[in-house]
């Protein structure tokens, strides 16, 4: 009887901890204050016989070659990370002040 109670409590604690970990991971994944973007630069990169990678000279600045370990080819990608939490939340008065003003005069 004592062993069954102890086993039941262990299982209950394990389930509780699992739910807490799941909840914290999904909450962190849904953070709307962070944005990570990846864009394809329109070209691929290759590794030559000397072991150096071809440069990524695409339309966009900041293109880098990303490749899997052991592969001789990769993709030229541009990555950008934006943390919106560094910007304050605009108040309604700031939004009103930033709106374009409507001209009430009529042009002929």
Curated annotation (Swiss-Prot):
Which locations, inside or outside the cell, does it occupy?
Answer: Secreted
**GO BP field:** negative regulation of chemokine activity
MF terms from GO for this chain are:
chemokine binding
* Cellular component terms per the entry's GO annotation: extracellular region
Q: Which residues are tagged as glycosylated in the record? A: 44
UniProt key word Plastid: no
Name the keywords, alphabetized. Answer: Disulfide bond, Glycoprotein, Secreted, Signal
Q: List the disulfide bonds.
A: 41-63, 45-65, 56-76
Region spans: Disordered? 89-108
Q: Quick one: signal sequence residues?
A: 1-28
What parts of the sequence cross the membrane?
A: none
Q: What does this protein do?
A: Salivary chemokine-binding protein which has chemokine-neutralizing activity and binds to host chemokines CXCL1, CXCL2, CXCL3, CXCL5, CXCL6 and CXCL8.
Protein name as annotated: Evasin P1156
């Amino acid at each position: 009887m004592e062993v069954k109670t102890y086993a039941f409590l262990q299982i209950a604690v394990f389930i509780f901890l699992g739910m807490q970990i799941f909840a914290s991971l999904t909450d962190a994944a849904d953070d709307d204050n962070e944005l990570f973007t990846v864009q394809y630069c329109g070209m691929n990169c290759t590794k030559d016989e000397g072991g150096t990678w071809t440069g990524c000279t695409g339309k966009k600045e900041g293109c880098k070659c990303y490749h899997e370990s052991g592969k001789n080819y990769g993709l030229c990608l541009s990555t950008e990370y934006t943390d919106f939490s560094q910007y304050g939340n605009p108040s309604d008065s700031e939004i009103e002040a930033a709106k374009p003003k409507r001209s009430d005069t009529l042009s002929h």
